[in-house]
From Swiss-Prot:
Biological function: This protein binds to the 23S rRNA, and is important in its secondary structure. It is located near the subunit interface in the base of the L7/L12 stalk, and near the tRNA binding site of the peptidyltransferase center.
Gene3D superfamilies named in the record: Ribosomal protein L6, alpha-beta domain
Protein name per Swiss-Prot or TrEMBL: Large ribosomal subunit protein uL6
GO MF, one example: structural constituent of ribosome
Keyword Transmembrane helix belongs to the record: no
GO biological process: cytoplasmic translation
Protein encoded by which gene: rplF
GO (cellular component) term, any one: cytosolic large ribosomal subunit
Assembly information from the UniProt record: Part of the 50S ribosomal subunit.
Keyword entries, A-Z: Ribonucleoprotein, Ribosomal protein, RNA-binding, rRNA-binding
Taxonomic path: Bacteria, Bacillati, Bacillota, Bacilli, Lactobacillales
Organism: Streptococcus pneumoniae serotype 19F (strain G54)
Entries under Pfam families matching the protein: Ribosomal_L6
InterPro entries listed in its UniProt record: Ribosomal_uL6-like, Ribosomal_uL6-like_a/b-dom_sf, Ribosomal_uL6_a/b-dom, Ribosomal_uL6_bac-type, Ribosomal_uL6_CS
Length: 178
C-alpha cells in the first residue's frame, strides 16, 4: 500500500486545478504549471481535495501512484508558495553578478561562466557569494541549482567551489612530507 499515494492534497485558497484526460493544469498566485500523468492513475478533485487512485495493487501501480501524488503536491505548493535553493561560493575571488536575467560567475577559470535563467526561474544575489535560485517548478529549480553547482563543485582538500547552503563537504588530508 502506498502511504504517500493515499494522502489527500488540500488545495490552498487561490489555487485552481483542471484535469483534462490526465493532463493536469494548476493555476495559482505565482503562475501556472501543466503536466501529463499516466492514464492508469485516476485523479479525482472533490471540492478543495485532490486524491489519486490506482486500479490494482501491482508493484508498478504502487510506484506510479506515489509518484503521481508527489508530483501533484509539488505543483500545488509551487504555484502557491514557490521553491528556492540557496548556493554559496567559497574560494578567493569567487563571486557572482547579475546581468539582466543572466548569472555571471567568476570561479577561478580564465573566463567567467554565464548561466541563462530558464523560463520561470529567477536568480537573486543577497551578497556576491550567495546565489538564490527560485521558481514555481521544483524540478526546474533543482536542475538549475545543480547545473550552477556543477560549474565548480566543491573540492575535498580546501573546500573551494559552489555548494548548497548547509551541504557537508567531506574533507581530505593533504599529502604528508618526508
Amino acid at each position: 500500500m502506498s502511504r504517500i499515494g493515499n494522502k489527500v492534497i488540500v488545495l490552498p485558497a487561490g489555487v485552481e486545478l483542471a484535469n483534462n484526460d490526465n493532463v493536469v493544469t494548476v493555476k495559482g498566485p505565482k503562475g501556472e504549471l501543466t503536466r501529463e500523468f499516466s492514464k492508469d492513475i485516476e485523479i479525482r478533485v472533490e471540492g478543495t481535495e485532490i486524491t489519486x487512485h490506482r486500479p490494482n495493487d501491482s508493484k508498478e501501480m504502487k510506484t506510479i501512484h506515489g509518484t503521481t501524488r508527489a508530483l501533484l503536491n509539488n505543483m500545488v505548493v509551487g504555484v502557491s508558495e514557490g521553491f528556492k535553493k540557496e548556493l554559496e561560493m567559497r574560494g578567493v575571488g569567487y563571486r557572482a553578478q547579475l546581468q539582466g536575467s543572466k548569472l555571471v560567475l567568476a570561479v577561478g577559470k580564465s573566463h567567467p561562466d554565464e548561466v541563462e535563467a530558464p523560463e520561470g526561474i529567477t536568480f537573486e544575489l543577497p551578497n556576491p557569494t550567495t546565489i538564490v535560485v527560485s521558481g514555481i517548478s521544483k524540478e526546474v529549480v533543482g536542475q538549475t541549482a545543480a547545473y550552477v553547482r556543477s560549474l565548480r563543485s566543491p573540492e575535498p582538500y580546501k573546500g573551494k567551489g559552489i555548494r548548497y547552503v548547509g551541504e557537508f563537504v567531506r574533507r581530505k588530508e593533504g599529502k604528508t612530507g618526508k
